[in-house]
Amino acid sequence: MTGRPDKRAIASWALYDFANTIFSMNVISLYFALWVTVDHGGQDILYSLALSGSMLAVAVSVPVFGVVSDQTGRRRLPLTLLTIISVIATALIGQTNQLWVGLFLFIIANYCYQSALVFYNSMLPDIAKHSNVGMISGYGVSLGY
């Protein structure tokens, strides 16, 4: 990055981090596990398998996304598409009463959420000088918590 930091870009960075925290804390850590076990009478293992399956897919694919991000410099479009898919899949979980459909939607939502982070994190050097990367990253963390 050269010149003055773009305040709008920094604010966008921080707000995205805020949304990440909401998704991670509420959907992944708290509510979806309860949705599976309490609302639908599923076993804990189903939640664990869905989470593990989505993370396995992430582990296989995000190195490729990282290469694409680094070599092409295209970050905004993949970030936007993955975020939109994650939001839609998350919203649809609340619209279904079928456990297996909800588990499938959760896998999609979490996969896209985790994959989007590759593009989101790679944008930080574009909005921050090397000397203030930590501070700007901290804005996002502090807003999220």
Where are the regions that the model predicts?
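Helix-loop boundary and gating motifs at the non-cytosolic
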Residues: T2-M55, L99
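Hydrophobic alpha-helical segments of secondary membrane carriers
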Residues: Y16, L49-A50, S137-G144
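Loop-to-transmembrane helix entry/capping segments in MFS-fold secondary transporters
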Residues: D44-I45, A128-V141
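Residue-level signature of mid-helix packing/kink "hotspots" within the transmembrane helices
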Residues: M55-P63
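C-terminal ends and interior cores of transmembrane alpha-helices
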Residues: A59, T80-Q98
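Cytoplasmic membrane-interface "Motif A"-like loop-to-helix N-cap segments
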Residues: S69-I84
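Hydrophobic core of transmembrane alpha-helices in multi-pass small-molecule transporters
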Residues: A89-T90, N97-F119
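Intracellular juxtamembrane helix-capping segments at the cytosolic ends
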Residues: S115-K129
